[in-house]
Amino acid sequence: MATGTIVIKIGSSSLTDGNGALSTERLRGHVEAICELRHQGINVIVVTSGAVAAGFTLIGYHQRPKSISQKQAAAAVGQSLLMQAYMDAFRLHGYTAAQLLLTRADFADPARFSNISQTLRELLKRGAIPVINENDSTSVDELTFGDNDRLSALVSGIIHADMLCLYTDVNGVYDQNPNDSPNAKKYHYLASVPEALLDRVSADTSAVGTGGMKSKLLAAKTAIELGTNVFIGNGKGRETFTDVLLGKGDGTYLGPFTNKTMSTTKQWIVFHSEPAGSIEIDSGASTALLKRGKSLLPAGVLSAKGDFSAGDIIEVFFNNRPIGKGKTNFSKHELELIKGLNSEEALSLTKRSKKAVIHRDFWVATKKECSY
């Protein structure tokens, strides 16, 4: 089997027993399957849920808590137990697990975003297996990923993974809920995530987790946009993970299965940055950006809004509709001076060295509303 990197997301429903508590037996089964991949030369990053499940009974809850404060308290107790279970299980097979706890703010800050990428690559280089979870005990509602499906998609992008595997207790994606409709049709392969399918599938979560099938499809959509192919399905058994990479997985494969990926810089721009302002451009500039792969020059700028500086991320509009985001080489004040001018005139006025308002290497088109 060829070498590569995959991200495996293991949800709470795949890690818990009938009472919703952490099942060490089930966890070790997943670890054994992951180690089988490592033996074959595959780099693996694990995104795991289960901290709440591991901790809630130890602080007196008789069932999985539902309020944010209760879940954060349970996660504070359970995260160390969950990680210890992973470390013990991987150690049995001669591997070292490495814990990373992430929040949405880690991705929003460009320096921290870069550090995540560098740390993951160094861990893989050293033969460790990164085990990632959201930092549930400190995340506030506005800064959460929503669920680990989304987190796993973002991780797959930052590491340029070959595949994202979203393991669940359902064996793939159906056109209807198979529990309600005996005639539900299973999709074995989808090149993309159709909006019509997103409208039909359930957003319901399991009793032990936060992500339903809709969450997984949204994560798949994000991963595909980032250049990572996706598998959604069953993840039980030692050979299961290998079967998935061989195209024999019990589930649904999603994506174009090409090698086209989005650069880490562009990932941060489109999925994580907060625009400091915006500009409106003309039709010629829109064509240059969207169809010809060119940079944006001052001549195509009509107006600017906000209070931004050179180096900030700004949103670009055409006909009052957003078409993308990019890093500006000019401040808002400078753009007001040079909008509509040719490049030589603009450089003469601003004394800048760069001709482009937004260079194509720091531009990302957003043709329609993305899943972030």
Curated annotation (Swiss-Prot):
Its EC number is 2.7.2.11. PROSITE patterns: GLUTAMATE_5_KINASE, PUA. Substrate binds at residues 49, 136, 148. It catalyses: L-glutamate + ATP = L-glutamyl 5-phosphate + ADP. Pathway: Amino-acid biosynthesis; L-proline biosynthesis; L-glutamate 5-semialdehyde from L-glutamate: step 1/2. It is found in: Cytoplasm. Belongs to the glutamate 5-kinase family. NCBIfam families: proB. Catalyzes the transfer of a phosphate group to glutamate to form L-glutamate 5-phosphate. This is Glutamate 5-kinase. It comes from Shouchella clausii (strain KSM-K16).
